Structure formats: structure tokens, C-alpha cells
Curated annotation (Swiss-Prot):
Its EC number is 1.14.14.105. InterPro entries: Cyt_P450 (IPR001128), Cyt_P450_CS (IPR017972), Cyt_P450_E_grp-I (IPR002401), Cyt_P450_sf (IPR036396). This is Taxane 10-beta-hydroxylase. GO terms for molecular function: heme binding; iron ion binding; taxane 10-beta-hydroxylase activity. It comes from the Eukaryota. It comes from Taxus cuspidata. The keyword Glycoprotein does not apply. It catalyses: taxa-4(20),11-dien-5alpha-yl acetate + reduced [NADPH--hemoprotein reductase] + O2 = 10beta-hydroxytaxa-4(20),11-dien-5alpha-yl acetate + oxidized [NADPH--hemoprotein reductase] + H2O + H(+). GO terms for biological process: paclitaxel biosynthetic process; sterol metabolic process. It holds the Pfam family p450. Involved in the transformation of a taxadienyl acetate by hydroxylation at C10 to yield taxadien-5-alpha-acetoxy-10-beta-ol.
């Protein structure tokens, strides 16, 4: 939305300047200089063969066309149209940068497996500013490795087993408070609240409902701002995101100060939650993380846990309803686990590992509705690929849509068919299924999100025997990320006796 406001405001300002040639000249001079510079950058490499495609308008490129299709029912259309016209390697311009899009598993592999060799991480300015320059998202090389090591103390398999009981308890409490006794609920807002509640509890042990709501509001504002055009003017999503980030840092800084005191006195343990893990982490040289690094990585973790979890949680029962056979398999699988439990016995790690049909359904939902539309990198050297040259400094983009929704990789891709992932997906062609990225930048929290989603399905089946969507054909839209049910997905509930 800010993109359209920005363009309209530029047009208005140019109209106002027409009566003043001197001011108009002064205003247009730097713009023309930028345009000439961009044209020089695009064309000075006449000796190399650039991919086919078009760069669109100067500065704006084809960003608006991309945003328009992402907010439709067919977000893959932007990529499909250009793939048909130009082939699997083409150039465009997005968010102010000349960009080469690589389609298919070979393109995915190049982008995801060549970190620090051919490409490096460089996200949009608005995203990096709001997430933080000291976050794992922004760091490269050795600094990135150190942060992955730190986060692995919280996100590794052993650590997650220790947090399983608390996560299950939080989800069980959520169903008791928000779902039980209701004839009808709207799933999306409940799922959003649950994700932030789990994060508040396991990231920094905040259980107070009022403070959780405050953090929820701030983090959603930051999330929206990070995906907007970086216009720092009153009323824009970006400005609101910056203000929310300042307030969030203020709250978290006070939590950090209190936790340090509790760790020194022995009230808190070093593996109590993510906050304790980050505060007590030391690298090989004995160095600790800075407070800013801790704040930035909290922001990054919230984004990661939200992006990879909210869509499959909100869509899983909508999709299962469209496939009665798998709906029955998932429910029977969960009922078998429930039936084997003694009164008051908690779900175990072994139980999670046995949820093969449930996990296949989740994997298929992530195939149909990947949490991100694309993965951007910056070329750190000239890249020679498929007969073309991608110049150093250009952006390189691969998109899950160019494989997840293509007939040649997943027959009848519009159909919800979890059986594609039988046998742990061994027959799925490598680099065709990339909902969590890959290589050094694989989402570090994907296992955390997996557990959240499986537990969510488990507790739903534990509480309800069936459900009926109010609108089974409700649209799924991205505004701009991730893809979600347009009206929140309301369902009628039938409690389990």
C-alpha cells in the first residue's frame, strides 16, 4: 500500500512544481542523474550476455507488478508469466535493484548452496533496519556461524525435547481458554495469539496476559513494517514499525537487566528459555553477545517463528477438509496416540516422531502455500549460469513458486495430496521443495515450528471430534506475507465427548 501512496505523492509533487522551472530543474537533476547511473550500470557490460527480461521503470522496476500478484489468489503468476516468456533465467528489477530470477531446482541449488562463495545475504533495507544489523539474518561468514551455534542451544533437538512439555501445556491451556465451549471460532486470530503466547513463554518467560498482548501488538507492527517500502514519514507502515521496535527494545532491555540479576542469584537457569541461553552463551574465545545482538536476534526469532508457523496452522484444517481420506488418517493417527496415554500423561518426543500422516499434511500445506515468496541474495562475483552472466552486485532471486507449483515436479500441483511426502519425501527431487530455504541459511527454527504445528493438531483432535468450515472455498491471500485465509477461516466446532 505504501508503494502506491509513494507513487501518487510523487505525481502530485511534480504537478505542483510545473509552475517553477528553476525548482523543477533542481528537483529533476538528481533524479535524472540516478537514472543515468542506473542505465550505465545496466549497460556498461556490453561484452557479457545478460539474461533476457526487462527492468521496468527506473528505481521502481517491476516491484508493483510483483506486489499485485502476491496479493492475489495466484501469487505464482508473476514468475510463471516471465518463465513462459523468457525461460528459466530472466532479469527484472525489484525494490530498486536489478535482479536475476533463477527458476527450477538448479536455480534453487545455486542460490541456496553457494553462500559466501557466489552470493551473500542482503535483504531489503526496511527488513534489515527493523530486524536488526546484529541479527543472524544480517550476519555473514564467521559471525553468522557463531550465532547459529548460540541459537542451536535453544533450537537443537535435545533442547527442544526439554521444552516439549511447556509448549504442549501452553497449547492445551490455549484450547481450554479460547476454543472450548465455543460453537464457532475464527481460526486465524486465535492462531496468531497462540504463536505469540508460546514465543513469549519460551523466549523470555513472560506469562502475564497484558504484557503478552503488548508484545504481540509491537511485534506484528514490526512485521508489517519490515515488509513495506522504507518511507520514514508519519503514518507509513515503516515509521510505525520503527516506533514499535524502539518500544520493544525498551521492554526487552528491562527483561535482560532483570534476568542477568536472576542468573547471578541462581533464581534463573542458563537453559530456562531463549533469553537465558543468549545471555550465558560464550563463543570459542569466551566472548558473549552484546545486548544489541540479543535484542536483534529476539526480533529475528519472532519473525522466523511467525512466518513459518502461522500459515500451516491457519490452513491445515482447511486443506484437510478438502481431502477426506487424509483427514481421516490424521485424526486416527492422533486418536491412537491419545488412546495410548494414561490419565494426565504428557505427550512425548516419541509420540511426535510417530505423527507421520500429520507431518505429511503439514509438508503439503507448506508446498502449496510457502511462507515466503522468494529468497534474495547478492552476487559477490560475476556468476556464469546457463549461458548468461549475472553481474557482481546484482540481486539473485529463487522462488519456491517456481518448483512447488509446477506440474513437472509435483503433478497436479493445485491438489492437496500429502502422500507426495510418503517415505519421508525421499522421492521428491532435491531442491524442488524449499519452504525453509536451504544450505547455511536454512531456517534455524524450522524444527521448533514443526513441533508447534504438530502439537496444535494434536490438541485440536483431543478436544474436537469434527468441524465444518463456514466457507470451504474461502480465498487464500498474501498481504504481502505469508499466505493466509482472507477472512480468518471460521469453523463450526463439534466437541469430543
Amino acid at each position: 500500500m505504501d508503494s502506491f501512496i509513494f507513487l501518487r505523492s510523487i505525481g502530485t509533487k511534480f504537478g505542483q512544481l510545473e509552475s517553477s522551472p528553476a525548482i523543477l530543474s533542481l528537483t529533476l537533476a538528481p533524479i535524472l542523474a540516478i537514472i543515468l547511473l542506473l542505465l550505465f550500470r545496466y549497460n556498461h557490460r556490453s561484452s557479457v550476455k545478460l539474461p533476457p527480461g526487462k527492468l521496468g521503470f527506473p528505481l521502481i522496476g517491476e516491484t508493483i507488478q510483483l506486489l499485485r500478484t502476491l496479493r492475489s489468489e495466484t501469487p505464482q503468476k508473476f514468475f510463471d508469466d516471465r518463465l513462459k516468456k523468457f525461460g528459466p533465467v530472466y532479469m527484472t528489477s525489484l525494490i530498486g535493484h536489478p535482479t536475476v530470477v533463477l527458476c527450477g531446482p538448479a536455480g534453487n541449488k545455486l542460490v541456496l548452496s553457494n553462500e559466501d562463495k557466489l552470493v551473500e545475504m542482503e535483504g531489503p533495507k526496511s527488513f534489515m533496519k527493523l530486524i536488526g544489523e546484529d541479527s543472524i539474518v544480517a550476519k555473514r561468514g564467521e559471525d553468522h556461524r557463531i550465532l547459529r551455534t548460540a541459537l542451536a542451544r535453544f533450537l537443537g533437538a535435545q533442547a527442544l525435547q526439554n521444552y516439549l512439555g511447556r509448549m504442549s501445556s501452553e497449547i492445551g491451556h490455549h484450547f481450554n481458554e479460547k476454543w472450548k465451549g465455543k460453537d464457532e471460532v475464527k481460526v486465524l486470530p486465535l492462531v496468531r495469539g497462540l504463536i505469540f503466547s508460546i514465543a513469549s513463554t519460551l523466549f523470555f518467560d513472560v506469562n502475564d496476559g497484558h504484557q503478552q498482548k503488548q508484545l504481540h501488538h509491537l511485534l506484528e507492527t514490526i512485521l508489517v513494517g519490515s515488509l513495506s517500502v522504507p518511507l520514514d514519514f508519519p503514518g507509513t507502515r515503516y515509521r510505525k514499525g520503527l516506533q514499535a521496535r524502539l518500544k520493544l527494545d525498551e521492554i526487552l532491555s528491562s527483561l535482560i537487566k532483570r534476568r542477568r540479576r536472576d542468573l547471578r542469584s541462581g533464581i534463573a537457569s542458563d537453559d530456562q528459555d531463549l533469553l537465558s541461553v543468549l545471555l550465558t552463551f560464550r563463543d570459542e574465545k569466551g566472548n558473549s553477545l552484546t545486548d544489541q545482538g540479543i535484542l536483534d536476534n529476539f526480533s529475528a526469532m519472532f519473525h522466523a517463528s511467525y512466518d513459518t508457523t502461522v500459515a500451516p496452522m491457519a490452513l491445515i484444517f482447511k486443506l484437510l477438509y478438502s481431502n477426506p481420506e487424509y483427514h481421516e488418517k490424521v485424526f486416527q493417527e492422533q486418536l491412537e496416540i491419545i488412546g495410548n496415554k494414561k490419565e494426565g500423561e504428557e505427550i512425548s518426543w516419541k509420540d511426535l516422531k510417530s505423527m507421520k500422516y500429520t507431518w505429511q499434511a503439514v509438508q503439503e500445506s507448506l508446498r502449496m502455500y510457502p511462507p515466503v515468496f522468494g529468497i534474495f541474495r547478492k552476487a559477490i562475483t560475476d556468476i556464469h549460469y546457463d549461458g548468461y552472466t549475472i553481474p557482481k552486485g546484482w540481486r539473485v532471486l529463487c522462488s519456491p513458486y517456481t518448483t512447488h507449483l509446477r506440474e513437472e515436479y509435483f503433478p497436479e500441483p493445485e491438489e492437496f495430496r500429502p502422500s507426495r511426502f510418503e517415505d519421508e519425501g525421499r522421492h521428491v527431487t532435491p531442491y524442488t521443495y524449499v519452504p525453509f530455504g536451504g544450505g547455511l541459511r536454512t531456517c534455524p527454527g524450522w524444527e521448533f515450528s514443526k513441533i508447534e504445528i504438530l502439537l496444535f493438531v494434536h490438541h485440536f483432535v483431543k478436544n474436537f471430534s469434527s468441524y465444518i468450515p463456514v466457507d470451504p472455498n474461502e480465498k487464500v491471500l498474501s498481504d504481502p506475507l505469508p499466505p493466509l485465509p482472507a477472512n480468518g477461516f471460521s469453523i463450526k466446532l463439534f466437541p469430543r465427548s
